Amino acid sequence: RYPWDLIVYNPSVLKDDFIRYGRKGIKGEFHSIAAIVGDSEKLYIEEGAKIHPFVVIDTTHGPVYIDRGAEIFPSARIEGPCYIGKDTQIMPGANIREGNSFGDVCRIGGEVEESIFYSYANKYHDGFIGHSYIGEFVNLGALTTNSDLKNDYSNVSVYLNGKPQDTGSLKVGSFIGDHTKTSIGTLFNTGTIAGLMCNITAGGILPKYFPSFAWYVNNKFMKGYGLDMMINTAKTVMGRRKRQWLDEEEYAIRVAYEMTEEERKEAIKKSRKTSK
């Protein structure tokens, strides 16, 4: 029913899918001083994937599936259950804890736990992302980190339709829409939602809800450069990954912009009042 349900069920789905596909073994390049911890029957490395020296792959708690063209750089550690998509790169020293799914052509560094990254998402640098859902072409600046557990260990609430919704879960991170970008050092609260094409810069304790297409700079919401500039940026980013911007995508984005205009204006209005 809710996006956080995807995070809850993803580890068990990963295990079921591995059994269903029935693939195991190493077809790609596996360096002689990389290591497998646990049952090697729970590891599948597709042809064209490359595992560098000092990588540790741990299947103790679930299977690991590394797809064609993926590259795992030195000293990275990967825990199952985990899926790593085609041409995705896991950066040196990354700590990929259990329960993660990464789509195609992602760049993943730092620490990640029980999260879903859609294709072309970029988390190149250090920082923690846990129990989160990250959309396509999201770019997380260096040291961007989210909280996924409250200090009092109570259930995390998430804002939906302007009201807090009890998730029923102790661990809930962030839900970040396609093409949203964060600055270096951005710190997300537990249960944060950021919509489409947001531009978020670090500064103090951040809100738990970011309307789509809003900019958040110097601790306040603002309109930013407007939709046309956002679309041009998206086209540039997609072109760098050899993805074409489709007319259908632009239509959907423009419709979403109109649908979220009122909540965006309201957030900007409240920011102006509190900054006076």
Predicted regions and their residues:
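Structural signal for interior beta-strand "rungs" in well-ordered beta-sheet cores
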Residues: 29-216
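Terminal amphipathic alpha-helical/low-complexity segments used for targeting or macromolecular assembly
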Residues: 1-41, 48, 203-206, 212-276
